[in-house]
């Protein structure tokens, strides 16, 4: 019954972790572009 626990881990991963990584990478890209 591993699949029953999969959505409870997949939803927060996509809903919280992915946007945080996307915002961090975008922020670093903008900062690097302004400094260069």
Swiss-Prot record:
Keyword annotations of the record: Chloroplast, Membrane, Photosynthesis, Photosystem I, Plastid, Thylakoid, Transmembrane, Transmembrane helix
Primary gene name: psaI
Cellular component GO terms, alphabetical: chloroplast thylakoid membrane; photosystem I
Pfam families in UniProt: PSI_8 (PF00796)
Record protein name field: Photosystem I reaction center subunit VIII
Family per similarity comment: Belongs to the PsaI family.
GO BP annotations, alphabetical order: photosynthesis
Domain of life the protein comes from: Eukaryota
InterPro entries linked: PSI_PsaI, PSI_PsaI_sf
The organism of origin for this protein: Nephroselmis olivacea
